[in-house]
Regions:
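Conserved alpha/beta-hydrolase catalytic His-Asp/Glu region
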Residues: 112-114, 131-187
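Flexible "cap/lid" loop of the alpha/beta hydrolase fold
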Residues: 92-93, 99-129
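Gly/Ala-rich beta-loop-alpha elbow adjacent to hydrolase catalytic centers
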Residues: 79, 83, 87
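Conserved loop-alpha-helix segment in the C-terminal half of the alpha/beta-hydrolase fold
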Residues: 31, 193-226
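Conserved HGGG/HGGXW glycine-rich cap/lid loop of the alpha/beta-hydrolase fold
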Residues: 3-49
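Short beta-to-alpha linker loops that shape the active-site pocket of alpha/beta-hydrolase fold enzymes
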Residues: 43-48, 107, 226-227
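Active-site loop/oxyanion-hole signature of alpha/beta-hydrolase fold enzymes
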Residues: 40-78, 240
Length: 248
């Protein structure tokens, strides 16, 4: 297994999946969950301390390989942002490996994002390789309005800077997602699912949450005063919601 991972605590396995960051994204939540569970946090391929790939990247199959390597037959997945997208795809393709599913402001394969979102992403990409400018543009998005004025701003900037440096190292590979996309299969989710999102997150991410509300049996919880980085700014709230859900 060449992916970087950390394991803390004992009990039922809980696997944490991040998006555009690294295991530091879970610093506060992981420490709380490790009181009661075996917590596995890992860096996706090409991020954090995990190696890049010379071939197309399939995060779903990477997760399967990690679970097999750790001899985890069944786990609860907690995914943030794109990590939530990966967790959803995994739950649809390997339902027997999932006990419960927790999604924090998740992405969704096949979802049509707004023109405004696409234009913002284009501006960020056009600013490359000026990492400071890319970070400035990204954090100017309203979905980061809470974390940027919190004590966790510096951690956020550090993770983004490291992530973007890693991105420039990637060879020309693409991400492989299962087909058909999850948006067409949400009704097939069998794992009991909790979706948590900050009320100050972006309109697009709130639309994703609403899509889950309409097309799956997921329980939706909106947290007041939280943005896209609810895992950094509201770890105690997440801990209470997640542990309550897992005890059901």
């Amino acid at each position: 297994m060449d992916l970087y991972y950390e394991v803390n605590g004992n009990g039922h396995p809980v696997v944490l999946l991040t998006g555009g960051a690294d295991v530091r994204n879970w610093t506060f939540v992981a420490n709380l969950l490790a009181k009661h569970y075996k917590v596995v946090a890992f860096d996706l391929r090409g991020t954090g301390k995990s190696p890049s790939s010379l071939e197309d990247v399939n995060h779903v199959e990477d997760l399967l390989s990690l679970l097999d390597h750790l001899e985890i037959n069944q786990a609860t997945l907690i995914g943030h942002s794109m990590g939530g997208q990966i967790a959803t795809e995994f739950a649809l393709n390997y339902p027997e490996r999932i006990l419960k599913l927790v999604l924090l402001a998740p992405g969704l394969s096949g979802f049509s994002y707004s023109k405004e979102f696409e234009e913002n992403m284009k501006k960020i990409h056009e600013a490359a390789p000026d990492i400071d400018r890319m970070i400035e543009l990204l954090l100017s998005d309203p979905s980061y309005r809470v974390v940027t004025v919190s004590p966790h701003r510096n951690l956020m900037v550090q993770m983004l800077r490291h992530h973007m440096k890693r991105m420039f190292e990637w060879p020309a590979v693409k991400l492989i997602w299962p087909q058909p996309p999850a948006i067409e299969r949400l009704g097939e989710l069998t794992a009991k699912t909790l979706l948590i999102i900050g009320k100050e997150d972006s309109p697009d991410n709130l639309r994703v949450a609403n899509y889950f509300r309409k097309h799956s049996d997921a329980r939706i919880i909106e947290i007041a005063g939280a943005d896209h980085m609810v895992n950094l700014t509201h770890p105690e709230t997440l801990y209470r919601q997640i542990t309550g859900f897992m005890k059901e």
